């Protein structure tokens, strides 16, 4: 989300980000947010099909690639009548394998690829990472509360990494009382004054 990027860029002055999206409206919205926050010198967006990254970037151009991909394979789950929503939710424009291949191309050797996905797609994700030349290195499940099943997972792959994955404790979003956890507050800088 561009709002998360804005928060991060305001806290880390040395960071620069290039965003890629296939949907012109999403790119326009993100560009407007960057302009309103005076971050256009460090936050830029490109409206391109990630399956064609080779035409727009040199291999190894980035240290880190982050992706919140469509969660569902084509023709699975509830299909939205809205084209933009359908593209954002299901792999109609690019498959998980396409996404991992693009990330691997964009990363320098040893670069990191961070992805969020649904638990039912964990095996697909690990296989797609390896097929693209990236090794899963860290895995963390995301749970709303301690007594709930994970709703998402966070995975980090390393281009050219050696086998071996570190399974980390779950990221809990809420305490038993429903309040945000201390860790979530730290992630969103809620523990610091702006």
For each of these PLM feature ranges, what is it?
Residues 60, 69-98:
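Mobile active-site "lid"/loop adjacent to the S-adenosyl-L-methionine
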């Amino acid at each position: 989300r561009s709002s998360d990027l804005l928060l991060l860029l305001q806290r880390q002055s040395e960071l620069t980000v290039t965003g890629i999206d296939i949907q012109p409206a999403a790119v326009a919205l993100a560009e407007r947010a960057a302009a309103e926050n005076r971050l256009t010198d460090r936050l830029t967006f490109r409206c391109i099909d990630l399956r064609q990254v080779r035409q727009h970037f040199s291999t190894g151009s980035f240290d880190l690639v982050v992706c919140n991909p469509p969660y569902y394979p084509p023709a699975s789950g509830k299909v939205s009548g809205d084209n933009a929503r359908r593209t954002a939710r299901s792999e109609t424009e690019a498959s998980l394998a396409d996404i991992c291949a693009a990330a691997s191309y964009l990363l320098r050797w040893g670069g990191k690829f961070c992805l969020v996905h649904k638990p039912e797609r964990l095996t697909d994700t690990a296989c797609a990472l390896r097929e693209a030349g990236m090794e899963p290195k860290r895995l963390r499940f995301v749970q709303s509360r301690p007594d709930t099943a994970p709703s998402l997972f966070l995975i980090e792959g390393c281009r050219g990494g050696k086998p071996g994955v570190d399974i980390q404790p779950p990221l809990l979003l809420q305490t038993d009382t429903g309040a945000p956890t201390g860790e979530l507050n730290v992630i969103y800088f809620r523990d610091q004054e702006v």
